[in-house]
């Protein structure tokens, strides 16, 4: 483009008069024509500039040219290629120039243009215009162009004679001049000496030529130029648009307005450009631009004008080109270096051509083809236009203007009545003659002042569409900016730099946007807009947005070069390679220009919405009083609203505001009559926007803003939607980069690699350092954002757009204090870094307020602030910040579609919140209003919400395409949008939140404190997958109730440390994705909670209060629609749930090691399913206060160290929960697999029950008022129907109802006995109690004869009677359905719980968990010891013992623990009591007891393990090793009793209130066992199933061992009664007395009442009512008992407890049946158990005593033998009665007799052999001296009587853990005869070998011993061993052999032995 001529910038003085140079006339005419052609020939028609066609008076200096046609192709060559703008036509009506001859140097040169018309077209560039950059000429300086033109004229236009003549005239004129024309160093002048130095005879200096003199003359003439342009009209035609943009300028004047004076600084020259009547119209396209209007010639006006063409600037690639002193050089010197001349003409450089382009680049006219450059003109391109011009010319030589009326367009922009004035004042310092000055002292000073009045513009919707279309066309080529351009070369200019000061003043700027689409159809639209443009204060009657800017002052200052003698270092541009940097340039980099600065001040800026009826609403407003409205909080609040300020607020839409804009500003505090409103703030006088930037350096633009208030009314967006919808179709993504631009290489210019370039590139800074230069720094004291949402319509169907004045929720204010925003420039290097920071925002504090509709003050509920410093710290606080960065993302898309991912990083040091219930309610209303507003505003379906608002994020408004990615992902795939992603990372160091929750009883507020540390939020969009992910993590949190005493509710279990905890407490991940094929939205929510404790302290009212606190109000969030599919996953790990009862001091902890739950909620689903899997679930309890929690690797150890005891554990739990979302909302819970484990001691289990019961009081049953039952008028005697003699009648023995009595008692009725014996015991008979048929499965091993079943039942003869069977029709269909007796109601309930497979193990430990229990036992032991010592003293003194000694020497604690004298020996056998015992025996017993106590309790001290006990005082407490009967008081390591239930299935149904049945529980267990783990017990299973009864019946397949049904019946009084039914399969019991005593002691334990932590509340004072059983039915239970007694309680015998007689006998196979019992009206479980015991015990004693006695061990053998004898006699008789075959009966009887007799004989023999073996082993121990060593191990803990039977008199209780476990010798029996013989041989050989070794070892021992009796003792000790060892082996061999034979004959007994023995 053009460069500013030198005379515009450096001519700061009045030109002196040039010497009178007389030129020849012919030379003058030829020179004039040549100059015009050289200057204007390329831009206009060339023939019009011929000397013959120019109307001129050369003598007067007047030249006039009419009807000039602009050469469009030449103008288009100067338009940049990326700009899609082309000139289609242009005309100049008249061009007039006046040269004031002969006073050329004093009078001005006047040039005027009249009626300039230019038509441009905005469209996509054509292929022809794309190559115009290659033909653009190079740029040359104006001085160079003038010099070249002068030289060309002299050497080509003139011949030698004319040139000689011209040189002589110039020489003569210079000699005659008395004034040195170059004293002031005129541009183009040459430094000559005084006039006297030039003489006619002296030749000109060698360096002065005629061309230089001629160039100086031209420069002096142009310095006096005055230019004027009138009637300028520029039209812009936009492609595919109906309207044309027309810019009209009335007049442009350029003149010299300097005064003839010189100040002390030097001479100054003032020039001015005045532009008048600027307007912009939108003209309809029907009115085409006039073809070529040739108006009538007008008179020449004397006014001085100037041209704007001379003010055009260069492209601006080199900053020095903008200075207007560029051309001030010596015209004798050429600026072209050899390198520049040698460069190709098509190479793009920073130099561009101007209007005085050098003739060296153009061919001469005289040369062939000189006119090829101007062939294509505007007329030739438009044939129609050319024909019209020819027609006009044929009519008249001077055509008349057209008179056709033209429709006027709609005015859009106006500059008002004031002119745009540009003043330029150039001042050059005075230089005295002969004084040598430096360049710095000779620098000119230029001052430019631009004054603009009021600019007013009004945009209609169609205008906005027009401009957007134009911008869209320009945007289409914005992506081509990265096409590499030519490299800039550093300018090597030695001219001094001008000191420039430029100031621009704009009075006001108004922009009005009419958003009402119907406004364009108004009849008075034209007049209204014209009136408003003329006077902006005139209102526009259409709804519109008005932007106002007042008093804009912009100032630019440039001090010039600091040292122009050295070339300035040019910073490489992004398209310049570092290879262009030479070594010498880097050395002078510090001598560049001093930084220039730019300053912009704006008085005021505002944006208002003007609605109809005079309503005005603010949108953007600068308010200096905002920052003084309240004081910022300096410390975090602790309670209440301390630290949270308040501010006045009001709804700006509440009232009509028609006054000034100050009505919406904040009123300063303290203003008033009494308060002296003199608090006049000075902020109003200052600018609201202040911008300052130092140019030419890396400093950023600093923008200071006053307090800014932004009003966001969502109804405004609703009113703008029609406009946005009309504009949205114009917004479309840019087209891909054309191939012709993509083919341009990144470095199209070859560069020479030199050593200097390599060194310079190495010393250059890295690209990343330059890429992060700060571009702008914006600072604002306070920014307030006020948001309001209009109330939704009353009915959803109403979707009308209203004014939005009604408000339902409230207003949200966001105040940002101390805002500092920094924007980085990342486009300075060619290679951008991988990650670059784009912007960074910091602020001191941000407060979020909320004010409801009725409130006049707003209170903040959220504050973002820096961390509060610790006391005494003076560190600079870390401010909250938001950083915006971008980095490339990996993508599989094409390279042209990949965009950078935007990263937003937010660092918030601290967040404080104070949330009240009105605020929560208001925010919920606000959120609901926004949601419903979106539904209403975007409900018509014409466009999606993202489409209307898409232009807001477009590049027109500074947005980014990437910000829209994944915002609405259910649209068609868009490559440009998908390729861009976004990541948001939020880091919060601390959160302190206070919740003020109203209490349910309206007694005030409950205050909750929520604190969290190290909170992180991360959001990431995956464009390729159409997925958005959100992650939330909290490392530490604390949620407490601080209303009175702080109670922690939720928090990390143990203190947070960096080494112990790595996982966050809360982790949330939300992923939203959309399937592009199916357009289904899917949401995945994952919640992970770990290492936390949730506590429920003494009440749960706060849960209801928080639920009520967060509950949405009625009518809120009712229209929300879920996504198509929602997946929810919840994971809990290392979680603890602390349950603190309301009254007791203890607590329960539920531990969760791992829980995972998953659910899916499809859109429109009728039910939801939740699947949960658990592992490691446990329950612990503590009796009192617990100790502090310490870090441990195991979660259970953490609580155990604090004093908790393990009680329950769930190893595996898998459940499935299904809930109906419609209808009645039924809930179904299926537990597919569960494994439960209970471990407890007597005291901890009781405490757990008490705490659980107390905690259950927190959930009282909501019972309705009792319904009053109707009363009868008369009484009824309920005993009228009672038969008093009913029980006195003897029952009929032979009746069918009493058939079961045959086995209850001894048979005595022969008739009935004969009938019963007809049925074989192997026949599948009817159950004697239930009437049910039980199948009998037999094997050949059980002694059944082959073919027995085929021959009939028990050999009976079946007779078939003749005759046909008559079948009754419909009989089978009419049979009634038999209801299962265990399923009263099969209808599932509203809540159905089903357990499919579960197992339960209960481990009962010996000892006690609580220190309180152990301490009570220890204290009682000491008390009993003191009493015994006192009694011993009394007995020693001779006093007699009385009956009171029994109470004094014993005590019973907790109804379970006996402390006192052991009743054994003579004392135990005495039936008289201690009071009548012998004193010696009593004293011996007391001494033995005291010695035992001394040994057990006084032996040593020990320290309990950490955490054993409750409370801190129990930790690390030393106490004595107290033992009770040889056992420790702490919990035993191993369980003593194990209760196992497996195969559990349960159905639980809860029915709605309208049903008569309230609940139903059906419980079944496939296996039930009780294992005996007591070390002194040799039996394995205390209770198990019975393999087969005495009749051979075995258990059915898949039969349940235990079945219980419990049904709850709802009464009219809303009370429930229970119905219980239970059935248990036959049980097999192996009862050891130690195990029985342990169970009695365990379950009879009654802990002392716990001290209540607080008085019972009113609702908990009433005791929990006991269960009331309306009906109880227990089906018969068959038992088979083995019992081994070990001691007898003689005290119980003396008290009359006959059950103690069982301890005298050893029972084996004793059978009994607990009869079928039906009860009614039983209250409580304890009453139920007592009643059952009272009914069953007498029945067993009365009716089944024979069966029980037959189980005594010696009697049992005789009974079995007697049964064989009976079979030998009775079976032949029975068989004879049946079929008369006596032989078969004899055979069966004989087999039974032989088998039973043989079994008993072998059994008795084995027992005798085992007993003999034990006696021999004990004798060996006594004789061999090993009685105290291993006799226990050999005997294996058993004592036998003389008959070899296990003795029941073994004294002592259950052993301690230190004792060795006893193993019975009957365990591990051989299974067959073969194994028996092998075991016998092995035993016999082992003992014989031992005897042999003993005999062989005697001689050696005799030899070694010395003395008289040594050898004798050795022989005596060896003889018994040698004799007894073979005997022991023999007895053991006999026992093994007999046991093997017995097990071979009776396999069923072998299986029972595996269950019996350990």
From Swiss-Prot:
What is the protein's known function? Lipid transfer protein required for autophagosome completion and peroxisome degradation. Tethers the edge of the isolation membrane (IM) to the endoplasmic reticulum (ER) and mediates direct lipid transfer from ER to IM for IM expansion. ATG2 binds to the ER exit site (ERES), which is the membrane source for autophagosome formation, using basic residues in its N-terminal region (NR) and to the expanding edge of the IM through its C-terminal region. The latter binding is assisted by an ATG18-PtdIns3P interaction.
Protein's cellular compartments:
Preautophagosomal structure membrane; Endoplasmic reticulum membrane
Q: What GO biological process terms does the UniProt entry carry, in alphabetical order?
A: autophagosome assembly; autophagy of mitochondrion; glycophagy; lipid transport; pexophagy; piecemeal microautophagy of the nucleus; protein transport; reticulophagy
The protein's annotated catalytic reaction(s) are: a 1,2-diacyl-sn-glycero-3-phosphocholine(in) = a 1,2-diacyl-sn-glycero-3-phosphocholine(out); a 1,2-diacyl-sn-glycero-3-phospho-L-serine(in) = a 1,2-diacyl-sn-glycero-3-phospho-L-serine(out); a 1,2-diacyl-sn-glycero-3-phosphoethanolamine(in) = a 1,2-diacyl-sn-glycero-3-phosphoethanolamine(out)
Q: Which residues form the Chorein N-terminal domain?
A: 30-121
Membrane topology listed for this record: Peripheral membrane protein
Keywords assigned by UniProt?
Autophagy, Endoplasmic reticulum, Lipid transport, Membrane, Protein transport, Transport
Ranges where the record places region Disordered: 286-319, 360-412
**Predominant location category:** membrane
Residue ranges with Low complexity bias: 303-315
Q: Please give the InterPro entries that the UniProt record associates with this protein.
A: ATG2
Instruction: Report the family membership.
Output: Belongs to the ATG2 family.
Example of a GO cellular component annotation carried by this entry: phagophore assembly site membrane
One annotated GO molecular function: protein-membrane adaptor activity
Where is this chain compositionally biased, Polar residues type?
Answer: 397-406
What superkingdom does the record give? Eukaryota
| Lineage, broadest ranks | Eukaryota, Fungi, Dikarya, Basidiomycota, Agaricomycotina
Q: Is the keyword Transport assigned to this protein?
A: yes
State the protein's name.
Answer: Autophagy-related protein 2
């Amino acid at each position: 483009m053009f460069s500013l001529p030198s005379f515009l910038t450096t001519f700061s003085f009045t030109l002196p008069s040039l010497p009178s140079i007389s030129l020849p006339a012919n030379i003058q005419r030829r020179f004039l024509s040549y100059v015009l052609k050289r200057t204007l020939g390329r831009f206009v028609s060339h023939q019009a500039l011929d000397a013959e066609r120019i109307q001129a008076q050369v003598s007067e200096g007047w030249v006039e040219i009419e009807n000039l046609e602009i050469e469009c192709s030449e103008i288009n060559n100067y338009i940049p290629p990326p700009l899609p703008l082309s000139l289609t036509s242009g005309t100049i009506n008249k061009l007039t120039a006046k040269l004031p001859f002969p006073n050329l140097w004093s009078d001005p040169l006047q040039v005027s243009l009249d009626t300039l018309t230019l038509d441009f077209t905005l469209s996509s560039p054509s292929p022809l215009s794309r190559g115009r950059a290659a033909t653009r000429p190079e740029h040359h300086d104006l001085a160079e162009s003038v010099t070249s033109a002068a030289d060309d004229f002299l050497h080509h236009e003139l011949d030698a004679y004319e040139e000689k003549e011209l040189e002589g005239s110039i020489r003569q004129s210079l000699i005659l001049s008395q004034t040195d024309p170059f004293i002031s160093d005129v541009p183009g002048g040459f430094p000559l000496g005084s006039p006297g130095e030039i003489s006619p005879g002296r030749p000109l200096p060698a360096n002065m030529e005629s061309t230089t003199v001629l160039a100086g003359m031209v420069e002096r003439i142009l310095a006096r130029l005055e230019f004027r342009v009138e009637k300028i009209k520029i039209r812009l035609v936009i492609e595919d648009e109906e309207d044309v943009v027309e810019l009209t300028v009335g007049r442009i004047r350029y003149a010299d307005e300097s005064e003839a004076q010189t100040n002390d600084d030097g001479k100054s020259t003032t020039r001015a450009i005045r532009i008048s009547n600027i307007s912009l119209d939108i003209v309809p396209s029907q009115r085409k631009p006039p073809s070529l209007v040739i108006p009538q010639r007008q008179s020449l006006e004397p006014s001085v004008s100037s041209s704007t063409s001379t003010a055009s600037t260069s492209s601006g690639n080199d900053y020095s080109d903008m200075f207007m002193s560029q051309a001030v050089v010596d015209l004798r010197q050429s600026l072209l270096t050899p390198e520049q001349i040698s460069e190709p003409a098509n190479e793009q450089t920073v130099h561009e051509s101007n209007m005085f382009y050098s003739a060296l680049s153009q061919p001469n006219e005289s040369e062939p083809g000189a006119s090829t450059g101007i062939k294509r003109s505007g007329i030739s391109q438009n044939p129609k236009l050319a024909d019209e011009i020819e027609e006009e010319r044929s009519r008249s030589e001077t055509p008349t203007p057209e008179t056709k009326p033209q429709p006027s367009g709609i005015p859009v922009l106006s500059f008002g009545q004031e002119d745009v004035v540009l003043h330029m004042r150039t001042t050059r310092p005075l230089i005295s003659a002969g004084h040598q000055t430096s360049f710095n002292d000779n620098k000119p000073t230029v001052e430019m002042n631009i004054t603009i009045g009021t600019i007013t513009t009004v945009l209609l919707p169609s205008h906005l569409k027009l401009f957007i279309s134009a911008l869209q066309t320009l945007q289409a080529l914005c992506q081509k900016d990265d096409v590499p351009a030519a490299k800039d070369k550093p300018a090597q200019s030695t001219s001094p730099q001008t000191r420039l000061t430029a100031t621009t003043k704009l009075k006001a700027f108004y922009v009005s946007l009419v958003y009402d689409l119907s406004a364009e159809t108004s009849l008075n639209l034209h007049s209204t807009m014209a009136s408003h443009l003329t006077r902006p204060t005139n209102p526009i009657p259409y709804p519109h947005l008005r932007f106002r800017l007042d008093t804009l002052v912009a100032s630019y200052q440039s001090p010039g070069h600091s040292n122009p003698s050295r070339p300035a270092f040019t910073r490489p541009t992004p398209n310049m390679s570092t290879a262009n940097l030479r070594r010498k340039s880097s050395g002078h980099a510090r001598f560049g220009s001093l930084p220039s600065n730019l300053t912009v001040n704006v008085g005021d800026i505002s944006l208002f919405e003007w609605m109809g009826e005079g309503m005005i609403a603010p949108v953007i407003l600068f308010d200096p009083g905002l920052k003084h409205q309240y004081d910022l909080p300096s410390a975090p609040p602790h309670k209440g609203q301390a630290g949270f300020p308040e501010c006045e607020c009001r709804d700006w839409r509440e009232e009509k505001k028609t006054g000034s804009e100050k009505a919406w500003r904040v009123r300063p505090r303290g203003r008033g009559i009494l308060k002296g409103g003199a608090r006049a703030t000075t902020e109003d006088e200052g600018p609201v926007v202040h911008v300052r930037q130092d140019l030419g350096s890396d400093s950023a633009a600093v923008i200071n803003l006053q307090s800014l208030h932004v009003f966001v009314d969502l109804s405004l967006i609703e009113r703008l939607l029609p406009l946005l919808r009309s504009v949205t179709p114009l917004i479309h993504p840019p087209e891909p980069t054309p191939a012709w631009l993509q083919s341009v290489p990144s470095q199209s210019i070859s560069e020479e690699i030199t050593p200097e370039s390599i060194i310079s590139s190495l010393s250059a800074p890295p690209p990343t350092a330059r890429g992060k230069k700060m571009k702008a720094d914006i600072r604002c004291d306070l920014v307030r954002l006020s948001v309001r949402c209009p109330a939704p319509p009353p009915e959803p169907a109403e979707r009308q757009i209203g004014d939005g004045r009604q408000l339902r929720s409230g207003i949200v204010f966001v105040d940002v204090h101390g805002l500092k925003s920094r924007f980085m420039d990342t486009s300075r290097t060619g290679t951008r870094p991988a990650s670059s920071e784009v912007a960074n925002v910091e602020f001191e504090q941000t407060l979020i307020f909320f004010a409801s509709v009725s409130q006049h003050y707003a209170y903040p509920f959220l504050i973002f602030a820096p961390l509060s410093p610790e006391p005494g710290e003076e560190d600079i606080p870390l401010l909250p910040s938001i950083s915006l960065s971008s980095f490339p993302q990996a993508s599989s898309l094409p390279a042209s579609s990949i965009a950078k991912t935007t990263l937003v990083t937010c660092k918030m040091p601290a967040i404080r919140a104070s949330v009240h219930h009105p605020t929560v309610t208001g925010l919920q209303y606000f959120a609901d209003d926004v949601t419903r507003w979106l539904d209403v505003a975007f409900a018509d379906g014409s466009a999606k919400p993202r489409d209307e608002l898409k232009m807001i994020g477009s590049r027109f408004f500074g947005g980014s395409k990437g910000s829209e990615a994944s915002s609405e992902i259910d649209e068609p795939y868009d490559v440009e949008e998908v390729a861009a992603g976004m990541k948001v990372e939020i880091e919060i160091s601390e959160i302190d939140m206070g919740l003020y929750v109203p209490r349910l009883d309206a007694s005030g507020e409950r205050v909750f404190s929520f604190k969290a540390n190290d909170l992180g939020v991360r959001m990431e969009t995956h464009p390729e997958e159409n997925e958005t992910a959100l992650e939330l993590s909290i490392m530490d949190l604390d949620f407490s109730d601080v209303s009175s005493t702080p109670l922690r509710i939720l928090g990390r279990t143990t203190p947070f440390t960096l080494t112990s905890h790595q996982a966050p407490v809360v982790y949330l991940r939300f992923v939203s994705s959309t399937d592009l094929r199916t357009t289904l939205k899917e949401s995945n929510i994952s919640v992970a909670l770990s290492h936390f404790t949730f506590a429920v302290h003494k009440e749960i009212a706060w849960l209801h209060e928080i639920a009520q606190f967060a509950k949405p109000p009625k009518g809120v969030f009712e229209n929300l629609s879920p996504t198509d599919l929602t997946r929810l996953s919840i994971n809990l790990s290392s979680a603890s749930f602390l349950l603190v009862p309301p009254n007791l001091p203890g607590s329960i902890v539920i531990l969760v090691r791992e829980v995972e739950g998953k659910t899916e909620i499809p859109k429109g689903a009728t039910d939801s399913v939740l699947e949960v899997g658990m592992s490691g679930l446990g329950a612990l309890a503590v009796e009192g206060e617990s100790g502090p929690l310490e870090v441990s690797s195991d979660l259970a150890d953490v609580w155990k160290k604090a004093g908790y005891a393990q009680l329950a554990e769930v190893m595996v739990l898998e459940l499935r929960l299904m809930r109906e979302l419609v209808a009645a909302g039924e809930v179904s819970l299926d537990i597919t697999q569960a494994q439960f484990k209970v471990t407890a001691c007597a005291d901890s289990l009781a405490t757990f029950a008490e705490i659980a019961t107390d905690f259950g009081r927190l959930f009282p049953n909501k019972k309705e008022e009792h319904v009053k039952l109707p009363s009868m008028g008369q009484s009824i005697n309920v005993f009228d129907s009672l038969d008093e003699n009913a029980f006195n009648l003897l029952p009929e023995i032979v009746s069918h109802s009493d058939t079961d009595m045959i086995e209850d008692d001894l048979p005595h009725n022969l008739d009935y006995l004969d009938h019963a014996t007809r049925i074989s015991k192997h026949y599948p008979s009817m159950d004697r109690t239930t009437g049910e048929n039980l199948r009998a499965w037999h094997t050949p091993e059980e002694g059944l004869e082959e073919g027995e079943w085929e021959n009939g039942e028990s050999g009976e003869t079946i007779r078939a009677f003749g005759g046909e069977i008559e079948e009754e029709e419909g009989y089978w269909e009419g049979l009634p359905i038999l209801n299962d007796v265990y399923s009263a109601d099969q209808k599932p309930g509203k809540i159905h719980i089903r357990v499919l497979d579960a197992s339960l193990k209960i481990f009962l430990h010996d000892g006690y968990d609580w220190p309180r229990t152990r301490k009570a036992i220890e204290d009682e032991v000491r008390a009993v010891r003191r009493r015994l010592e006192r009694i011993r003293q009394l007995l020693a003194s001779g006093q007699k013992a009385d009956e009171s000694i029994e109470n004094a020497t014993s005590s019973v604690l907790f109804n379970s623990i006996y402390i006192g004298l052991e009743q054994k020996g003579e004392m135990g056998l005495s039936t008289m009591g201690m009071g009548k015992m012998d004193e010696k025996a009593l004293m011996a017993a007391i001494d033995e007891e005291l010695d035992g106590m001394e040994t057990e309790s006084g032996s040593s001290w020990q320290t309990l393990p950490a955490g054993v006990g409750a409370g801190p005082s129990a930790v690390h407490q030393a106490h004595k090793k107290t033992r009770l009967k040889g056992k420790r008081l702490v919990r035993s390591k191993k369980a003593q009793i194990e209760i196992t239930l497996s195969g559990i299935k349960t159905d639980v149904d809860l029915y709605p209130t309208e049903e008569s049945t309230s609940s139903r529980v059906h419980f079944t267990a496939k296996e039930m066992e009780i294992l005996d783990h007591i070390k002194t017990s040799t039996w394995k299973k205390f209770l198990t199933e019975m393999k087969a009864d005495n009749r051979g019946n075995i258990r059915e397949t898949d039969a349940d061992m235990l079945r219980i049904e419990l049904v709850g019946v709802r009464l009219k009084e809303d009370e429930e009664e229970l119905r219980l039914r239970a059935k248990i399969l036959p049980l097999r019991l192996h009862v050891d007395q130690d195990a029985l005593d342990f169970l009695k002691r365990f379950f009879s334990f009654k802990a002392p009442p716990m001290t209540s932590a607080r008085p019972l509340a009113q609702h908990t004072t009433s005791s929990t009512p006991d269960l009331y059983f309306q009906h109880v039915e227990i089906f018969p239970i068959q038992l088979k008992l083995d019992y081994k007694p070990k001691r007898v309680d003689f005290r119980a015998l003396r008290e009359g407890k006959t059950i103690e007689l069982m301890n005298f006998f050893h029972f084996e196979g004793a059978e009994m049946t607990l009869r079928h019992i039906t009860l009614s009206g039983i209250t409580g479980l304890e009453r139920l158990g007592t009643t059952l015991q009272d009914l069953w015990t007498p029945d067993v004693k009365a009716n089944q005593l024979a069966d029980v006695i037959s189980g005594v061990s010696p009697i049992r053998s005789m009974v079995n033998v007697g049964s064989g004898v009976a079979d030998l006699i009775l079976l032949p008789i029975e068989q004879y009665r049946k079929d008369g075959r006596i032989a078969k009966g004899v055979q069966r009887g004989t087999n039974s007799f032989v088998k039973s007799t043989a079994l008993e004989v072998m059994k008795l023999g084995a027992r005798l052999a085992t007993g003999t073996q034990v006696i021999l082993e004990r004798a060996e121990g006594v004789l061999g001296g090993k009685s105290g060593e291993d006799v226990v191990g050999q005997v294996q803990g058993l004592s036998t009587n003389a008959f070899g039977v296990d003795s029941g008199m073994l004294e002592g209780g259950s052993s301690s853990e230190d004792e060795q476990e006893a193993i019975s010798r009957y365990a591990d029996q051989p299974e067959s005869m073969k194994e028996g013989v092998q075991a016998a041989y092995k035993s016999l050989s082992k003992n014989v070998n031992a005897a042999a070794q003993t005999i062989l070892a005697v001689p050696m021992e005799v030899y070694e011993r010395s003395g008289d009796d040594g050898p004798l003792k050795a022989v005596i000790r060896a003889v018994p061993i040698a004799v007894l060892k073979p005997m022991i082996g023999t007895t053991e061999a006999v026992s093994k052999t007999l046991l093997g034979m017995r097990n071979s004959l009776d396999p069923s007994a072998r299986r029972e032995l595996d269950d019996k023995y350990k």
